[in-house]
A protein has these predicted regions:
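Membrane-interface extramembranous regions at the lipid-water interface
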Residues: 1-98, 109-155, 161-165, 180-184, ...
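Membrane-interface segments at the starts/ends of alpha-helical transmembrane spans
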Residues: 100-107, 143, 175-196
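Transmembrane alpha-helical segments of integral membrane proteins
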Residues: 163-174
Length: 224
């Protein structure tokens, strides 16, 4: 390995580490802001810090292989979404203080949507990244799990959009009305969040960590 590529790999590892910790931290902070008082006492700082970690991570990744057009294009899209999330993050705190304010609630919904888009796009970034790495097993695993993640998120969005569309209709068959009532229960919403968010986030974190290990192994050798 040439010494010239070592600084580039350092930025890559730093970016992957920031993404690995930033994903669950952002999700946890945004949820806690809605239900707990402790993070609210810190004001806007927690969601700004966690979304800032994601933005920092993507910016660090962009310093690896800047000549690869497909890789950089995928990163630019992820960076744009990370920047939007960073800009909208303070509204999580504002909404937690004034939950009845419709404007804040709509901004938080927009943040949830762009956050999901970021997760979607970052899975595409991982596909581009592992295509440049020499580990065939990692490429196969990433190809399978990112496709599964993307299909899961798209299906969840379609399902959620379908429920909202049906809820707006005036006349529906009794069976559909009963299904909508079940879907609106707290338990059903929790299950939807688990499928739509927690599963893709956990699998993405696993892929990020495996990719980081492969990069470190290429520099220092495999772990004993």
């Amino acid at each position: 390995m040439t010494p010239d590529i070592l600084p580039s790999l350092r930025h890559l590892v730093r970016g992957l580490t920031a993404i690995f910790w930033g994903l669950p931290a952002t999700l946890l902070i945004c949820v806690l802001m809605a239900v707990a008082e402790l993070p609210r006492a810190l004001g806007c700082a927690p969601p700004i810090i966690t979304t800032g970690m994601l933005l920092f991570g993507v910016c660090e990744l962009a310093r690896f292989q800047p000549q690869e057009r497909a890789w950089q294009t995928a990163l630019e899209r992820a960076k744009l979404l990370a920047l939007v999330n960073f800009g909208l993050a303070p509204f999580v705190y504002f909404w937690s203080r004034l939950p009845s304010e419709t404007y804040y609630f709509q901004i938080v919904l927009a943040l949830a949507f762009t956050g999901l888009l970021f997760l979607y796009q970052f899975n595409l970034v991982l596909q581009r990244l592992v295509a440049m790495l020499p580990d065939e097993t990692l490429r196969a695993d990433t190809r399978f799990f990112t496709r599964f993640n993307l299909a899961l998120m798209v299906a969840g969005l379609v399902l959620m959009g379908g429920f909202h569309l049906l809820a707006e209709l005036k006349s529906l068959p009794p069976a559909v009305i009963e299904l909508l009532e079940v879907a609106q229960t707290a338990r059903s919403r929790f299950a939807l969040v688990v499928v739509l968010v927690l599963v893709p986030v956990s699998m993405t974190m696993s892929l990020v960590w495996k990719t980081r290990d492969v990069v470190l192994g290429s520099v220092f050798g495999p772990r004993s």
